């Protein structure tokens, strides 16, 4: 912005005359500290273009007359500039630097005004070089640096880009929603799945829609174009389709409709059948190098390859189904077999009748009731004695003692009850006393036997 505001004429005025630099910069800064409104600046640009176009004709004639004295005047001005006091040049450079920091922003001129300024540039330079005419020789040569004459190209403002190319009228600015653009610039979390979440603030479009567009009525042509296009049966998709998305081997081949309707000819059916090799062609066929050729089978191998016949006395395995003879099916059971076939009938779940509740289940014979047992039977009938240290089975529920209910836990028991604490796995702990040597070991002296054992074995 600041570099484009410096014109070539202002730079040349500093080179030709060091005394006038400070005055020109000061007057220019004071005039530019208060910028004019945009409409007045545009009118001044248009009026200046017309005035420069009229003044070009008069300046061309003066330029031809002053061209002969150009070399003499420039060399004189160059000498006068070298002979001038150096503090003045420093002041000019300081004023130029202050001008760069203080100079307000000016609107960029249009391309037409820039071309007109480029056309009138040499005329202005010739006029400013007429100040010194005394010190130049007739054969002097002009040497000027390109950095002093080069004009900085003005940067076009956004307002000039939005202007109409013919009328130069500014178009109304369109404001963008910065938040909406940032949301759209972010990549999607998952490819192919749109983000359907809606919350307050992301429903606004990128550009604000005007009221006229919202109230506009659609024409028949736009309604016809808004309808989706009908897909034809001859439509062929652009990308390759697959049966399964996991692999790339199962491609869906495109078969034309006439190929599905047509019938193959007899010639095609004959060619579609596999070839039948003849024995002569197999014998005459050349062997491929690298393959093994087997010899013809011997008569013994051919005889052994024939399957054996079954023996006429061979009986096949018996089937699972058992066949019952006709005599067994037609036999008649006797009454005794029928009685034995019935299950035993139990009375009240017992095999015998119970006379009284005191008597045993099974009846005892009278001889057994009158018999006298021997001493051996009486000894065996007695139960064994229980051991002195025997304790009976404890009940599932027993009372807890008073001492157990009113006991207090000691510090040692609490310490043992706590689980063993371990440090985190990401931290490595080391014991500084691992490589510590005892004082007695430092003062110890090795015996002759230990020294002998410490020496390596000589082989």
Curated annotation (Swiss-Prot):
Name of this chain's protein: Sperm microtubule associated protein 2-like
Effects seen without this gene: Deficient mice are viable and have normal fertility.
UniProt-annotated stretches for the region Disordered: 1-138
Compositional bias segments (type: Basic and acidic residues): 64-73, 91-112, 127-136
Compositionally biased spans, kind Acidic residues: 47-63
UniProt feature, compositional bias: Low complexity: 21-30
Pfam families xrefs: THEG
Species of origin: Mus musculus
Start-end of Polar residues biased regions: 77-87
InterPro entries, per database record: SPMAP2-like (IPR042401), THEG (IPR006623)
THEG repeat ranges per the UniProt record: 172-190, 212-231, 258-277, 291-310, 327-346, 367-386, 403-422, 440-459
Cleavable signal peptide: none
Keywords, sorted A to Z: Repeat
